[in-house]
Amino acid sequence: LVVWVWRGGQLVLPDPLEVVSWSEQEDGGDSVKVGRKMSFTVADPAGRLGAWRLDDVLGVAGTRLHVVYKVGGAGAVNLCRVRITDNQPDEVVESRVVDEYGYLEPDGSLPPHKRRVFSVRAVVRVDAVDLTVDADNDRFESPVSPWPGSTVKSEFPWLMLRHFVTVFDDDVPDAALPSGLIFERERLEAGQDILARVGARYRMGGNGECQVYMPGGEPVLRIEPDAGLVSVQRKQSSSGLYNRWVVEGKEAADGSKITAGVSLDSGPLRYDGPHGRVPFFYSSTMIETWEQAHAYAVRLRDEFLASLAVELEVSTVPRPELQAGDRIEVGCPISAGHVVYFPGTITSISRGGDMVPRETRVRVACAYGDVDYALTTTPWAEYLTDQLPPLTWDRMPATWGTLPEITWNEIPQNHLL
C-alpha cells in the first residue's frame, strides 16, 4: 500500500507512510452505516509519528489517509480515503551519555558536563474508517424537513454536502419526497431512509466520493478455478428458517385480538414437512383489521423468500477493484465432476498484506433459487461440437481390441531400412 497523510486539505508529510502490515474490512449489510474499516502498522524509526497532541501527524482530530493499492507492475488503484479514529504507538527507548560542556545538574547521577540523551524507535498501530463517519457524527441539532419539491437525488447530496461528493449510478431512479417528512438527530440514517425509498444503497469510492447504486445487475467478475479462485467454503444453519408468519393486531372498534397467518406450502421448508413447524410472530397496534394482518403476513413471507441465500466464503487472488455490493459469479467444482457458476452479491470483503498484498476474501450471498438452478445445469455442455479427433489406437473403443504386442525381433528386416 501507498498511504498519504492529509489534514484540512493539505498534505501533512512529503512522503507516504512506511506501512509494515495492514488489513481492511468492508461490510455492505443493509443496516451498516460506516462500511469500511482499516488497520495499519506503520514503521516509525525516528519516533516522531506517535501522537501526543490531537493534531499531531497521526492524531485523531481530523487526520485523513489516502490509500493507494499497488498491484505489482499492473498499476495502482485508489482504494479509499479514510479518517484516523485510533492510534497507539509501541515504542522502544534507548539512551546514551554524551558530552555537554557547561551542563551541570544538581544531585544528578552523571558527572559535570555529561548529559543523557534518549532516542525512540516505534511502530504505530493506526485504525481508520471511511468518510461516512463524519456524516454519522454530524447529527441534526433540531428537526429537519426537505424543501418543497425535493427528490431523492436532490436531498441526499444536500444532506451530505459538507462531508463528501455524491455520485449516482445511471440506473438509480428518482422519486419525490413527502412534504411532511421529518428527520431528527441522525443525519446518515436519514440518508439511508431517503435512498431506501427507491431501493438504492451507498458506498464510498476510491477518491472519497459517495457512490449511490442499485443492488443487483450483471456480474462484474467471474472467479473460478484457474482464474483467480483459491478456495470456496460454505455452511448451513437452521437458525431463522421460518415456515409460517403470524401477525397480530387489535380491532379498532372493540379492541378484540386479530390474528392472521400464512405458511410455506411447498419446498424443503414447507409447513408440517420434514423441517417441522417454525412460526415467526409479529404484533403491532397499528394493525386494526384482519386484511391488514394478512397482507403484512404475506409481505413478511415474501421478504423471507427473497432473502433466502447460500453464503459462500471465497478466497481469491488480490482484487482491489472489488467492492461490497458488487455482483460476481463464483465457479465451484461439484461432485458431478464439473464447475457450476453461482451469481451472487458481495456482502463483505477482507483484505490484508505486509510488504506485498495477500489474498482477498469475500463473502458472497447467492439467492437460493439461483443456487438450486445452477446445480441442475452442465455449463461445459455448450462447448460440445460435432468435431472429432483423428482415429488412432488410443482413441478406439475398448471393444475394438488392443494394439498387438510387437517386439523388435519380430519386425521384418526390410522394415528397418
Which positions does each model-derived feature cover?
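Assembly/oligomerization scaffold segments
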Residues: 1-146, 193-199, 203-204, 213, ...
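Amphipathic, non-transmembrane alpha-helical segments in extracytoplasmic/periplasmic proteins
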Residues: 33, 40, 128, 143-168, ...
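Short aromatic-glycine-enriched beta-strand elements
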Residues: 360-362
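SH3/SH3-like beta-barrel fold
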Residues: 364-366
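Glycine-centered loop/turn motifs
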Residues: 60-64, 149, 184, 226, ...
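Exposed loop/turn and edge beta-strand positions of beta-sandwich/beta-sheet ligand-binding modules
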Residues: 78, 122, 241, 340, ...
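Acidic, small/polar-enriched beta strand-loop surface segments
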Residues: 1-13, 192, 196, 206, ...
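Surface-exposed aromatic
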Residues: 172-181, 309-310
